[in-house]
């Protein structure tokens, strides 16, 4: 068996950058096809350096994604769609529609990064998942309404609810009990009284 470094992911063998052990014939095929390189000491060192750079880049992208997720959490996403009196949409909301809505608000999100668990065919509130990074999926609320008047009422209600939650959270922090350090507080008078008693005892002696 020969050890090779995979230059691309191969099903059943490993991911790009991983070391795989294969038969000599298969190793020659992978090397000739440019899908792998020999696992020499120098190549292993180069791989380690490349992986370190890739990890740092991934961490940087994750930090940026966390900022985007925080911004998304502060938004109110409202989509206006035509619907019947009973709330059934004339059509449905697709992932591309959600991506377009987010894009109109300045978020660079592709349709393939948006997914939800149910088909949106009615007026209402829905949870939308946005994959910002391989390790981070933001969950946002989407409100589907009939017209601009409903949209404005929804925005105001969401703003009031958030204000109430923030106020409640701030109140809980203020009302949180302060832990007692356990230090005993002794008054000056009691210390003086003890000193006086000690002097009196000494005088008797």
Swiss-Prot record:
GO terms for biological process: translation. Pfam families: Ribosomal_L9_C (PF03948), Ribosomal_L9_N (PF01281). GO terms for molecular function: rRNA binding; structural constituent of ribosome. Keywords: Ribonucleoprotein, Ribosomal protein, RNA-binding, rRNA-binding. The keyword Transcription regulation does not apply. Gene3D superfamilies: Ribosomal protein L9, C-terminal domain (3.10.430.100), Ribosomal protein L9, N-terminal domain (3.40.5.10). One of its GO terms (cellular component) is ribosome. Residues 184-195 have a biased composition (Low complexity). InterPro entries: Ribosomal_bL9, Ribosomal_bL9/RNase_H1_N, Ribosomal_bL9_bac/chp, Ribosomal_bL9_C, Ribosomal_bL9_C_sf, Ribosomal_bL9_N, Ribosomal_bL9_N_sf. Binds to the 23S rRNA. This is Large ribosomal subunit protein bL9. The gene is rplI.
């Amino acid at each position: 068996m020969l050890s090779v470094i995979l230059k691309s992911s191969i099903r059943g063998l490993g991911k790009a950058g991983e070391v795989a052990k294969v038969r000599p014939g298969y190793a020659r095929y992978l090397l000739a096809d440019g899908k792998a390189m020999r696992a020499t000491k120098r190549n292993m060192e180069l791989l380690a350096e490349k992986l370190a750079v890739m990890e740092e880049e991934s961490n940087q992208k994750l930090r940026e994604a966390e900022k985007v997720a925080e911004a998304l959490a502060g938004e109110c996403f409202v989509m206006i769609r035509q619907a019947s009196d009973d709330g059934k949409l004339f059509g449905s909301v697709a992932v591309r529609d959600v991506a377009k809505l987010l894009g109109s608000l300045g978020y660079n999100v592709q349709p393939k990064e948006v997914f939800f668990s149910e088909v949106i065919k009615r007026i209402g509130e829905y949870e939308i998942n946005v994959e910002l990074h391989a390790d981070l999926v933001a969950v946002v609320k989407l409100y589907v309404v009939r017209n601009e008047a409903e949209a404005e009422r929804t925005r105001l209600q969401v703003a009031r609810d958030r204000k109430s939650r923030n106020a409640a959270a701030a109140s809980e922090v203020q009302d949180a009990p302060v832990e007692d350090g356990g230090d005993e507080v002794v008054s000056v008078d009691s210390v003086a009284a003890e000193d006086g008693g000690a002097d009196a005892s000494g005088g008797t002696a």
